[in-house]
Design a protein with these regions (language model features):
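Short hydrophobic/aromatic-enriched beta-strand-loop microsegments
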Residues: 143-150
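Histidine-anchored nucleotide/phosphate-binding helix
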Residues: 32-36, 132-142
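Conserved N-terminal glycine/acidic-rich loop preference
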Residues: 97-131, 155-177
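Alpha-helix C-cap/termination motif
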Residues: 38-39, 114-115, 141
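Active-site acidic carboxylates
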Residues: 1-96, 118, 148, 163-171, ...
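Short strand-loop junctions, especially beta-strand C-caps/beta-turns
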Residues: 18-20, 125, 152
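Short beta-alpha junction loops
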Residues: 49-50, 152-156
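Catalytic-loop motifs flanking and including active-site residues across diverse enzymes
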Residues: 73, 77, 127-134
Length: 177
């Protein structure tokens, strides 16, 4: 029996409306919300999580735009995403993984293969940073689980970088739909 997981990466206010505001993310957010509403399977969310010392970190030195600082409004999952989840699951808390870097490093403990997961769809923001990091970590950890990315449910920092990430997915045997 097929068992699917939808991993929604960093659908946070700072990536859509805030510090790293992105018109493509604004445009594609309704697609992501519809995907959540219509998903038949498990759903997990990741939440990019930084602290006040962000600009002193390696990431902050390279992307010197403070964003997703824990406890701020920009750190929160977008209201539209929460509402889409709530329509299906009621007041159940969003199952969220707080991550301190581009990719979550706890997938080994999750034992997704032992849970019978046969396919993981990874969607969200930013395609060229956190989405690609999650995809490649998952592909390395679980080479026999099918990994899929829905192009119109993701957005990069810009369209050129988004397209470049999609090309890399294809090279790494990740299905882009």
């Amino acid at each position: 029996m097929e068992k699917k997981l939808l991993l929604v990466v960093d659908a946070q206010k700072d990536f859509v409306y805030g510090a790293l505001r992105n018109e493509e993310a604004i445009k594609r957010l309704p697609n992501l919300c519809n995907r959540i509403r219509n998903w038949k399977g498990l759903i997990l969310f990741t939440q990019d999580t930084h602290h006040e010392n962000y600009l002193e970190t390696q990431e902050g030195k390279n992307l010197n735009i403070p964003h997703c600082i824990e406890g701020t409004d920009g750190w929160e999952i977008c209201d539209e995403v929460k509402e889409a989840y709530k329509e299906i699951y009621g007041d159940m808390t969003l199952p969220t993984i707080l991550k301190k870097s581009f990719g979550y490093d706890g997938w080994a403990e999750a034992q997704l293969d032992k849970l019978g997961i046969t396919e993981i769809e990874v969607d969200g923001f930013c395609t060229d940073i956190c989405v690609i990091s999650q995809v490649l970590v998952l592909k390395a950890m679980y080479p026999e689980i099918k990994i899929v990315v829905k192009e119109d449910c993701c957005a990069g920092l810009n369209e050129k970088k988004h397209q470049a990430a999609l090309e890399i997915f294809n090279s790494c045997q990740v299905e882009v739909i």
